[in-house]
Structure formats: C-alpha cells, structure tokens
C-alpha cells in the first residue's frame, strides 16, 4: 500500500512532519539513531524505487523479528561456548539491521528491557562477565590440577601413614628438619610465655610436633628426634610405657625430668640406663623422687651437664656427691634442698670442682647443723655464686662476712630463713656498708635475733630511687618492723623538708 503524502511517509508520522518543517530552527528535534535498546517492530519498512515507503504486513514484521531472535540466540550460544568471534558478530548485526546514514527509524512504541538476552553481544556487560567467569573457572581448575600433589597427608585416611603420594619437596630431610624445628621452637616459646611446664612424653594430640609424626616416615623420624630432646615423666605408667616401647633404641635427650614419682625406685628404672645416652644431657632433674638416683656411670659422660636438680632425695649422700662432682666442670645450677644426708664434706667437694656454679640451694628443715660456714666459704671462694639458698642451715655472722667480702658484689638472691644464729652484727651491718649492691631478693623469715631493720629499709628506698625492684621477704614480726621503719623515715624526711623550706623563706625575708 502506497500512501499519498510523501512527506508524512518520509518522516514516519505527522509529528515528525511537523518537526521537519522547522528543520533549520535551533530548537529542532535531533534525528533518532539506532541503538541496541531501540524497538525494531517497524524495521520491515523498505524504500521503493519511486521514493515512497512500502510497509510490509504485520505477519511479515513478526517473521522478521523471529529471524532476528534466532540470529541473536545463536550468537549467545557461541559466546557461552567460547567460540564467539567479535568481528563475525558485528558483521552479523550489520547484516541483520542494514542502515544507512540517511535512514531514520520511527519512534518505538515501548522500550525493551535493558538486560534482554537478545542483546548479549561482545559489547555488552553481560557477555563480558560471562567470558570472565568462564576464564576464572578455567584458571581455578588448572591451579587445582597443578597443585593437587602438594598435599602432605590424606585427611580421609585412617592409618598413620597415608597411601597418597606426597610432593617430593616434603620428603627432603633438610627441609623437613627446618619445618619441624621451627614448630618445636614456637611451641616451647609459647609454653614459656604462658608459664607452662614442659609437657609429659605422652603428650596430647593437640601438640603440633606430635601431629607431624603421622605425616610420613621421614616426618616421623625427624619429629621423634625433637620430641626425644626433652623427656619429662610425671607418672610411673608413662615411664613404664616409654621403657617398654624403646627397649632396644638409644636416645640422646638434652633434658630428662622425673617429677614427683615416689613409687619409682632404682630397681624398676634400670631401663633408663640402657635407653638413655647421657652424652648430650644438659638438664637432669629428679624432683621429689626420694627413692631413685641417676646412675654414677652416667656422670662420666655428663661433661655438658649444666643443671642437676635432686630435691627431696633420701639416697644421696656425701660419697655420691664426691664421686660425681669431679665430672661436672660445666655445672651451673645445683639444687639439693631437703637432702638431709649431705654435709659440709659434699658441698666443699662441689665448690672445689664446679667452678662455673652460679646457683646452689642446700636449704633444709632437718639436720641443719650438717651445713655450716665451711660450705659457705668454699662456695664463696671457688665459684661464681649469685643465688644461694641456706635456709635452716647453721650459718653464723662470721660466715656471712666471709660471703660478703669474697663475692658480695655478685650475690643477687639470698635465702636465710630459719638461720637462728644470725644477729644484728651480720646482715644489718652489711647493708649499712653496702656489701650487697646487686641484691634483688632477700628472705629472712624466722630469725629471732635480728631486730634492727633500719639499714635494710634505707637500702630498699635507695633501690627504689634507682627504679630497681627489690623484695625483702620476712615473717610477720620482721614485716611489721620494716613497715614501722618506713613510716618513721618518711615522717623524718617530711620534717626535714619543712625545716629546710622554713629556713629558706626566713632568709629571703631578712634579705
């Protein structure tokens, strides 16, 4: 059908005709261009050779739209399969919608949806997102495939050693040793920061180093070496299990600790002599194990031993101490508290052979008369003693003066509880002359003959003025004396300050 009015047909509507009549006006409406969101219901119009417009029937327009829909669906499926060619798609669009610069499109009746699937072209955001997601999935799959062999152990496996092959890098002993070493150091450091003691050999499964035992044979071997460095037993059952499991293997620990095992004796602990190689031992401790002693033949190899802790032992005596001390040139810490069978003879032998000794505790509640000033003098002359425990011993004022003159500058901790022979002519006078300038801890409980604490309090005030912490621990009587002396010194200081200020003000008035 050909319409008679060519102007109307040229512009598409009467409104367009009205706009075209004022084409040269500055307020003229711009020509609408084709966009991907424009409606194409009327794109079936074609220009005839006579210059008039021919409109196809409505059924033809629907068929044209149907063909366009098929084209775009095919393009979308190619894009999703990764076979899309941007250049080819652009040509398809140009072929499907032929336009010329002079051709004008009619105003659409309705606006299509912006996210219509028909317009998922390479230039659209939806298509770009689809391609990007496909590429990311592909990369992730490649990463998972490439690094799948780097798993240490198969978590689904119920056996100790996994049947899954681990990456070769985790089977190099040097690398495994560095990893386990760092875990071991971190675990020990955390225990020290939290104030925890070293765990028992039968440790919980939460231990990081213990968990490394189940990784592989290489990891098991390396981890055992670190776990065997520090052996501590708090129950007799754990010690028995250890002896039964390691009956044929030698271990070289750096520390061996038996803690409060009164039911263990030398007969049922002979397996330790077979299993333990003492060459690397630095810390040997039998804490409150009254019926067991380390074998004497061990000490011939214990040249590296630095700590020997045997408190509450009923078997140790001077003969045993004299035999072992000659093999302990590097001993630094000796704890023989409540070892009632030790006398001056044993301590003098220790002072003679153990030149590196810095801490010695020989305090006791019974047989205090067995330790006298001879032991104190031997330690003061021959060792580098800094911490000395003499609680309950038969110490006199003369021995304290010997200690102060020989090594008073080195003493940092001094325990003199229940040393009933000490009087005001020893400690109070020594503090008055500042014989212990580096003393930080002083224990003077239950010393009946000490009544003058004035110089101790002044020493304490002097330490505080230098911001150096100091602890003077006494019984109730001595504590009250110290508090009263502090109050009097403070009152005297205020009185002196008031007097000086008054004198200064009066001098200003006279001038």
Curated annotation (Swiss-Prot):
Residues 45-58 have a biased composition (Polar residues). GO terms for molecular function: small GTPase binding. Its main location: cytoplasm. Residues 99-112 have a biased composition (Low complexity). It comes from Candida glabrata (strain ATCC 2001 / BCRC 20586 / JCM 3761 / NBRC 0622 / NRRL Y-65 / CBS 138) (Yeast). Pfam families: LRR_6 (PF13516). GO terms for cellular component: cellular bud; cytoplasm; nucleus; SCF ubiquitin ligase complex. Residues 27-58, 99-119 are annotated as: Disordered. It is found in: Cytoplasm; Nucleus. Negative regulator of the mitotic exit network (MEN), required for multiple cell cycle checkpoints. Required for daughter cell separation and chromosome stability. Involved in copper sensitivity. InterPro entries: Leu-rich_rpt (IPR001611), Leu-rich_rpt_Cys-con_subtyp (IPR006553), LRR_dom_sf (IPR032675). This is Antagonist of mitotic exit network protein 1. Gene3D superfamilies: Ribonuclease Inhibitor. PANTHER family: GH16156P, PARTNER OF PAIRED, ISOFORM B-RELATED. Belongs to the AMN1 family. GO terms for biological process: cell division; mitotic spindle assembly checkpoint signaling; mitotic spindle orientation checkpoint signaling; negative regulation of septum digestion after cytokinesis; protein-containing complex disassembly; SCF-dependent proteasomal ubiquitin-dependent protein catabolic process. Keywords: Cell cycle, Cell division, Cytoplasm, Mitosis, Nucleus.
